[in-house]
Amino acid sequence: MIAKHIDDILKSPSNGVIRKMFEEGAMLKKQFGEDKVYDFSLGNPDLDPPKEVLKAIKKYSKEKTQGCHGYMSNAGYQSAREAMAAKTKKEQGIDVPWQNVVMACGAGSALNITMKALLNAGDEVIVPCPYFTEYDHYIHNHNGEIVRVKTKEDFSLDAQAIKDALTEKTAAVLINSPNNPTGRIYSDDEVKALADVLKEWGDKTGRYPYIISDEL
């Protein structure tokens, strides 16, 4: 017997929908030919990695330094964390100490780690609709509850709708930009309006919900 919550996930209609579509697409391509099947499931890149990346991988795969392929810090290599902190400062003007940067293997891993760190049982995470369906599982994996809110007609964030959905159990608001599946990119003004709503709520209640931003 497996854990009930895992059994519930496996039986859920939304479980792995995108992966199921991908597998179905692969089968149909074999049956009818790749040129006759349009796959809108996984967000596989259309372009190959830059040559510089491939060169670096080849270089480090031949690295002879003792221990270079051993275990690393749980948060990732310092050089990678420093590079990400510098990138954030350059692109967003935010001075993030590299010690505050944690590397993860993909967004799914990063979001699960984040939910584990933030959620107590029964805490709520507000998610604007439509959204990436795996968010349901990322939140439920850590005993949280997803609270769905509508966006505006153009799929922009509706700060008032999010404000109306806030409760004493709200731990975070999870946004995704560019949004999957709409492609909407949230503007600075939208995100600032959301931040203002959450700060106002925190000033009032003493609990400041986090903004979790899943970005590409």
Where are the language model's segments positioned?
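N-terminal small-domain helix-loop-helix segment of the aminotransferase-like
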Residues: D7-G106, I113
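Conserved core of the PLP fold type I
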Residues: Q66-G206, I212
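Walker B catalytic acidic pair
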Residues: E215
